[in-house]
């Protein structure tokens, strides 16, 4: 079962093992994304910011910093997977193909497991395998992610302001 959503969020009860969610948004990676992420993380590998150096490698141009791609693929899935939850961790992060400036990244996630939380009766633990891919379908990242998700009856509902 595959579905594309508008990002309304899911409560624990909405996750079904085997469900594949195609996240609706894509994002084109810019040079600014790569430079900013590389600088803020103090990543001194010139493959990310030195075009002259990168031109001499097998890639021929700067590679996009992989932690940015991890954040991007995670971010593309938030509205569907963890809007009503918190991350417990990432596992088995893999980067089978490079990402370059100008690539557009899309994502999908498959629900691997869903169980009641042992320590929080008002929540459940969901594990997904997320896949990031380029505009041509090339897979650029995969990872497993565990999320603690609210059950519907316990979902925090902040009051909306009165706009009268």
Predicted region positions:
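Hot-dog-fold acyl-thioester-processing enzymes
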Residues: 2-88, 141, 152-164
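Mid-chain, well-packed structural core segment of small domains
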Residues: 83-88, 93, 97-101, 107
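HotDog/MaoC-like acyl-thioester-processing domains
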Residues: 1-17, 100-104, 108-164
């Amino acid at each position: 079962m595959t579905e594309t959503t508008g990002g309304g969020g899911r409560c624990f009860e909405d996750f079904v093992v085997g469900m594949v969610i195609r996240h609706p948004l894509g994002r084109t990676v810019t040079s600014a994304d790569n430079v900013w992420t590389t600088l803020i993380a103090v990543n001194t590998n010139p493959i990310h910011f030195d075009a002259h150096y990168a031109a001499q490698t097998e890639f021929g141009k700067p590679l996009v910093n992989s932690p940015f791609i991890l954040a991007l693929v995670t971010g593309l899935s938030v509205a569907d997977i963890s809007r009503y939850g918190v991350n417990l961790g990432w596992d088995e992060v893999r980067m089978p193909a490079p990402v370059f400036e100008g690539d557009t990244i899309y994502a999908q996630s498959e629900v691997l497991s869903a169980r009641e939380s042992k320590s929080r009766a008002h929540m459940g633990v969901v594990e997904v395998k997320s896949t990031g891919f380029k505009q041509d379908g090339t897979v650029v990242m995969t990872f497993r992610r565990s999320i603690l998700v609210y059950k519907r009856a316990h979902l925090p509902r902040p009051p909306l302001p009165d706009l009268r």
